[in-house]
Amino acid sequence: MKGFIHDLFLDPHFSRADIACDIVDVPDDFITQYRIVDPISFKPIYGRSGKLETAYWGSRASERQVRLYNKKLEQERKKVIVPKEIDTRWRLEMQLRSGKATDWHAMVQESLDSFASPHFLPIDIKPIDKIVIDGLIAEPSNWSIIARHTKYKYRNLLKQESQNDELTNHLRETFKESADELKKELDTWLLGLDVTEK
């Protein structure tokens, strides 16, 4: 099948890649404080309870859109049986298009470098900086009312936090463990190399 697909196209490439990771049994209140801190659009969707159910970063038409959503809630609404031992399940999903799809490995790393929360800020952070970060995360529209150099300062602080963040580092490790196998599989689809049909 892979050889057949390869023979059909002169320059085979991916125009879209969806890469997802499930986050299981991390409390909802902990997860919902995470943000992609890049200067891209942010669209949160809240349920009737007022709790975050889905968050989008980037527009649907952009080359990169990141979505964080309550996968357990989605499954329950679709009447999918969820194992009783799973308390929470969130999914972080990156949808990449055009050139970003081809450069999927770097785009995942870049997205994770911007996936931050207030949970693991440096212990020596100034109290005023912690208050501002809490305010920016609680009310993302506040980003639009602060000066450009101030935005840069707090984005940089959050990106530093991302390097110490236990959850984000776990996602990095999981991706690192899977990336080589995923790349090998994608390469065989694209290039028809080293494919043994059984």
Regions flagged by a language model, labelled:
Residues 1-150, 161-198:
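Structured, helix-rich domain cores that form ligand/interaction pockets
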Residues 151, 155:
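Helix-turn-helix DNA-binding segment
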